[in-house]
Amino acid sequence: MNKELQPKVVFLMGPTASGKTALALELAEKHNCEIISVDSALIYRGMDIGSAKPSAEELARGPHRLIDIRDPSESYSAADFRADALSEIEQIISMGKTPLLVGGTMMYFKALLEGLSPLPSADEVIRADIQAEADANGWEALHDQLREIDPVSAERIHPNDPQRLSRALEVYRISGKSLTELTMTKSAPLPYNVVQFAIAPRERKVLHELIGQRFRIMLEQGFIDEVAQLKARDDLHLDLPSMRCVGYRQCWQYLDGEFDHDTMVEKAIAATRQLAKRQLTWLRSWPELNWLESGAEGNLVTLMRHCR
C-alpha cells in the first residue's frame, strides 16, 4: 500500500527536558490528535514528580494514554509497549483522529517502528539449570557450549557476562534456535504513514541548564517525600526497573545515608544529563527525522503542516 494512503501517525521524540510535553499539548489543542506516552517512567503509578509526569491540568488539556498503567513493583518490556501502543493507535485512528506518540524512550519507539525479534519468554527452570551448571563447571565451560551452538553470539558475549551468556543459552534450549538466528527475524513493521520529529535545544549547555533547573523544581515539589513513600514499601528495591529511573535511584541512596543532600542533587542531575546524551545519540542516527529547536516559534506550525 502506498505510504501516503496509510493512516498518519506522528512521533515527537527528544531528550528529557527538551519541551516535548508542552509542544504536544499545543498540538493536541489545535489539531485532531490524541497523545500516547512513550516513556518507561511514566507508566508507573505513584512516580509522578521524579518522572515529570504531566500535571492534572495538563492531562485535562491533552489526555495521555499509557501512563499510570503499572505498579512500580511490576516489569514492562518493549514488547509490552509495542502491543499496548498498537492497540491505542488503532483505537485513535478508528475515532478519526491522529495518534501523536510523545516521549524519550527510544527503545520503545524503535520497537514500535521496526518490530521485535520473536524471543521466548524467560523459563525459570531452564535458567536455574544453567546457573547450576555454571556453579559446577564455571561460566567458561558454558561459554564453550555457546560457541558451539551460536558462534556469532559467543564472539559478542564475554565469558564474564553471566546474564547475557545465560540468556543466550536459555533461548537456544527453549526454542532450539540460536539467539543470532532469532534476532534476524523481526515482526511486521508499523503499517502506517509515520512522520517523525525530534526536539532539542541547539546547544548542549542549554539542555544541561534545563535539566538542572527541572530537578531542583522537582525537589521543591516534594520529590524526596515521593521516593520516601516508595521506599517504605516492602516490595520495592533498587534492582527493579522502576527504581532504576534517573533521580529515583540517587534519592533512594540519599535516604539510605550513602551520601549527603548536595551530592544526591549532583548525582541525579549528572545521571539525567547522561540519559539525555544517550537519547541524543540514538536520535542522531535515526532515519527520516525532522528536527525542531526547543522553544522555536515555528514549531507548532511545522507540526501542524505535517499532520494534515
UniProtKB/Swiss-Prot annotation:
Keywords: ATP-binding, Magnesium, Nucleotide-binding, Transferase, tRNA processing. One of its GO terms (molecular function) is ATP binding. The record marks 105, 127 as: Interaction with substrate tRNA. ATP binds at residues 14-21. Residues 39-42, 163-167, 244-249 are annotated as: Interaction with substrate tRNA. It is an enzyme of class 2 (transferase). Substrate binds at residues 16-21. InterPro entries: Dimethylallyltransferase, IPT, P-loop_NTPase. Its cofactor is Mg(2+). One of its GO terms (biological process) is tRNA modification. Its EC number is 2.5.1.75. It catalyses: adenosine(37) in tRNA + dimethylallyl diphosphate = N(6)-dimethylallyladenosine(37) in tRNA + diphosphate. Belongs to the IPP transferase family. PANTHER family: TRNA DIMETHYLALLYLTRANSFERASE. Catalyzes the transfer of a dimethylallyl group onto the adenine at position 37 in tRNAs that read codons beginning with uridine, leading to the formation of N6-(dimethylallyl)adenosine (i(6)A). HAMAP family: IPP_trans. Monomer. This is tRNA dimethylallyltransferase. It comes from Shewanella oneidensis (strain ATCC 700550 / JCM 31522 / CIP 106686 / LMG 19005 / NCIMB 14063 / MR-1). The lineage of its organism: Bacteria, Pseudomonadati, Pseudomonadota, Gammaproteobacteria, Alteromonadales.
